[in-house]
């Protein structure tokens, strides 16, 4: 090349894209809002090691039709950067001059993960991560391994808020730390000699929005106005990157405002308080083994308002993963909670549970096992009418003109607070929630609500917005929810 000639720039990262691509962590999530150049950053990142002959990469979307835009963009960038590279449309794979390969794949159903069994990829990228379930993502972590010497092994993902995986993605990447701060998880590995070794794995979230993509705004000045004109939930998610409000969210009424924990106005989450002795106590239960089991205790005041005052959630700490303990052990833990907690000790407690625990078609029922000595835990079958139960949630979450809803939750009930606002609608049964989610707390609460049905409120009130002339609250929502 003549010294006066200049190399053609195929693609130049925006500052936030560059920040994402420079991260050293084994896992990184890029996104939040729309228009930040997420897909381009993922596509270009996959090229980092194509000079290594044995390098193998995989870029995933939920379904193959959704891959079309990514493939089109790869045709534009990859072919210009590597003119000799070839794309096989049948196998959905790019083959580079060195022999390196980048595949495009999908995982429409969780069972499709077995298509990648026995495979190894140095780089795995997920586009629109919230469209995937935790079991799908975690399985692919086992496929993320070196294909030969000298490769860097890591995973990258992009996404907007919303979708079936919203809850686990938020819990894994958004909630634990501020954006750009590494989230370090310590795990214990049992070695062949019987000793335990502590190991660490890090991940990070890098936020992006249309404001980080001046090239897009310059090319399409109207795009910003398009995002701003969306319905409120979609606008908050796609324009400002809010993880509290998103399209497809079932319980848009939900509010968690620490400023009102004490006065109990305009918030569903409140500070714990002593329960009067004359208030009835109810216990809801949803059985789980490989999935979490859920127990919630509720107090009922004179006005019929329900308070979730305590919970026992049988999960491992990983999304939607149960403790795998039998009904008798679950009964033991429930009874211990009621004997040791001052809010529950000595109280008459009414139990209502999923009717499925009374099934005797395969032997002794779960309900019978729990009722045996020494725990003597008794249940009555709950009303399992799904849509009616969902509507009871909506009725009770609405705020009255004085700012009080008919269902409130103690701030100590962390799993309720985590899971309920993340529930999304089922795409095929659009009036009901998607049951593939972590819906166990929702179910046990629904059984209790159906024991205390209320009529639809005559008028619904919305919580007042705080005085925020500089929109500082809105900006804070973008960075940390």
What are these regions (language model features)?
Residues 131-213:
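ASCE P-loop NTPase helicase motor core
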Residues 1-26:
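Pre-P-loop entry segment of helicase/translocase ATPase cores
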Residues 55-67:
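Conserved RecA-like ASCE P-loop NTPase motor core of nucleic-acid helicases/translocases
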Residues 212-287:
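ATPase catalytic-site recognition across NTP-hydrolyzing enzymes
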Residues 66-122:
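Inter-Walker segment of RecA-like/P-loop motor cores
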Residues 39-53:
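Walker A/P-loop NTP-binding motif
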Residues 127-128:
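Walker B catalytic acidic pair
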Residues 296, 304-437, 453-460, 464-465, ...:
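Mg2+-dependent endonuclease catalytic cores in nucleic-acid-processing enzymes, primarily RNase H-like
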């Amino acid at each position: 090349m003549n010294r006066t000639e200049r190399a053609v720039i195929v693609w130049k990262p925006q500052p936030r894209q560059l920040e994402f691509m420079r991260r050293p962590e084994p896992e990184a999530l890029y996104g939040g809002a729309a228009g930040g150049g997420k897909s381009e950053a993922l596509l270009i990142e996959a090229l980092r090691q194509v000079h290594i002959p044995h390098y193998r990469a995989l870029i995933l979307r939920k379904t193959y039709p959704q891959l079309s835009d990514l493939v089109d963009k790869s045709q534009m960038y990859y072919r210009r950067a590597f003119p000799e590279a070839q794309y096989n449309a049948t196998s959905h794979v790019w083959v580079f001059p060195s022999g390196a390969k980048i595949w495009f794949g999908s995982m429409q159903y969780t069972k499709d993960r077995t298509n990648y069994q026995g495979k190894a990829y140095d780089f795995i990228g997920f586009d629109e991560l919230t469209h995937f379930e935790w079991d799908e993502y975690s399985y692919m972590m086992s496929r993320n391994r070196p294909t030969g010497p000298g490769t860097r092994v890591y995973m990258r993902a992009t996404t907007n808020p919303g979708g079936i995986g919203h809850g686990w993605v938020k819990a894994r990447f958004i909630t634990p730390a501020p954006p750009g701060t590494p989230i370090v998880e310590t795990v214990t590995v049992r070695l062949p000699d019987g000793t335990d070794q502590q190991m660490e794995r890090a991940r990070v979230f890098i936020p992006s929005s249309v404001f980080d993509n001046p090239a897009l705004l310059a090319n399409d000045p109207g795009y910003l106005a398009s995002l701003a004109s969306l319905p409120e939930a979609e606008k908050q998610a796609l324009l400002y990157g809010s993880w509290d409000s998103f399209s497809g969210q079932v319980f848009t009424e939900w509010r968690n405002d620490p400023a009102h924990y004490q006065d109990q106005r305009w918030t569903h989450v409140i500070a714990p308080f002593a329960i009067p002795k004359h208030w009835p106590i109810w216990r809801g239960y949803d059985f789980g083994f490989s999935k979490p089991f859920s127990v919630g205790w509720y107090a009922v005041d004179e006005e019929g308002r329900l308070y979730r005052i305590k919970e026992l959630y049988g999960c491992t700490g990983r999304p939607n993963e149960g403790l795998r303990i039998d009904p008798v052990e679950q009964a033991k833990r429930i009874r211990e909670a009621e004997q040791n907690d001052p809010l529950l000790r000595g109280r008459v407690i009414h139990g209502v549970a999923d009717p499925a625990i009374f099934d005797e078609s395969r032997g002794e029922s779960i309900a019978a096992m729990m009722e045996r000595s020494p725990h003597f835990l008794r249940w009555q079958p709950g009303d399992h009418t799904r849509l009616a139960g969902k509507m009871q949630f909506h009725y009770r979450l609405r705020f009255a003109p004085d700012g009080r809803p008919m269902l409130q939750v103690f701030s100590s009930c962390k799993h309720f607070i985590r899971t309920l606002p993340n529930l999304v609608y089922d795409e095929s049964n659009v009036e009901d929630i998607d049951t593939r989610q972590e819906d166990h707390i929702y179910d046990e609460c629904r059984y209790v609500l159906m024991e205390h049905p209320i009529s639809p409120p005559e008028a619904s009130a919305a919580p007042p917005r705080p005085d925020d002339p500089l929109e500082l609250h809105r900006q804070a929502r973008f960075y940390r929810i």
